[in-house]
Amino acid sequence: MSNSADLASCESADIQRRILELIEGASSIAISGHTSPDGDALGSVLGLGLSLMKFFPNKDIALLLADDDPVPRIYRFMEGADRLVPASAYTGNPDLFISVDVPVVERLNNSAEVLRRSSHVVCFDHHPAREEFAELSLRCVGAAACAMIIDRFLDNCGIVARNGVATCLLCGLVTDTGRFQYQNADAAAFHAASRLVAHGADPARVALEVYQSMRVEFLHLKSIVMGRIKTVAHGRVAYSYAYQSDLEACGVTSDECDGLVDVVRSVMGVEVCLFLKGIEGDTKVRGNLRSKGDLDVSEIAANFGGGGHHAAAGFSNNGTIRETLAVALPMLAKLVGEDPASVTVEL
């Protein structure tokens, strides 16, 4: 997507009208992002949810977390973050369930059960979908962040996100573009950021809380991850990892690890990279993939049941770090045009 007109062209006025009608007709609404939420998932849930709460004060609106984990520390500054509740603790049968930043229902984790109890389902998303799971979907694959779609939808409905709510949406945009350093940071993304700042969003607060407030314990873990970086495929693929025991030894929680993949991505000459984090006693892993160019790492994530974009994707896998690397690294080598058989796993 090269300009804001492209974003407008993928928005159907009819679908938006029908979504608004569902919102207006619902007495109870539940909104959720994906499992292991990032800034865009949380910012989109909060931006949409808080806006609807202000515009429709008599509606029962629940803001859900797909997991039982707490809100990641770096995102707790956002307005309304204290309103987010685990989907497993929500017992309602909402008239309307709204999914944001979720391409497949499996990524809803515990929120999928709430979806199944709902009368109607709506989806806002910017990922490609293998199949639609919602009654109505406002899907714009070219948008840099789901927060952009939420902002445009609200504006088209006559609802303007301002100040703290606008900051939530800006956080989604900033984090999903890697501080406007990824390939998706196009003219439309900058235009959306300008709109949000004009409406009171605070970019300095986003930068401070998300990127400039690291705990010393996290920096110790970061140094471990940096020390483990390896490259394969003639330096075109990089990877690193952290065991659950590393997090425990450093005093770091799992939710603080968002962003460690960018340490691996920063290696000169690397085209794609992988960061793995051990969970559940290192019997499972969560993986983050990044690409510096046009190579599509979401294809790799899809092989593990995950998803994402060309430049950024994630997945979970039942297996150890070594086992996951043994499968993923040959795929990444093939993606960059190198011989998969040449790859050996080093820990």
Regions found by a protein language model. Give the residues of each.
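An acidic intrinsically disordered interaction segment
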Residues: 2-18, 113-121, 142-144, 148-150
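Short, hinge-like loop/turn segments at secondary-structure boundaries
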Residues: 49, 78-83, 139-142, 291-292
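Glycine-rich, phosphate-binding/catalytic loops in enzymes
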Residues: 47-49, 114-117, 139-140, 191
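Hydrophobic helix-and-loop "lid/oligomerization" segment in the mid-to-C-terminal part
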Residues: 2-35, 43-76, 91-96, 175-303, ...
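Short alpha-helices
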Residues: 124-193
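Active-site cofactor/cluster-binding pocket
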Residues: 76-79, 83-136
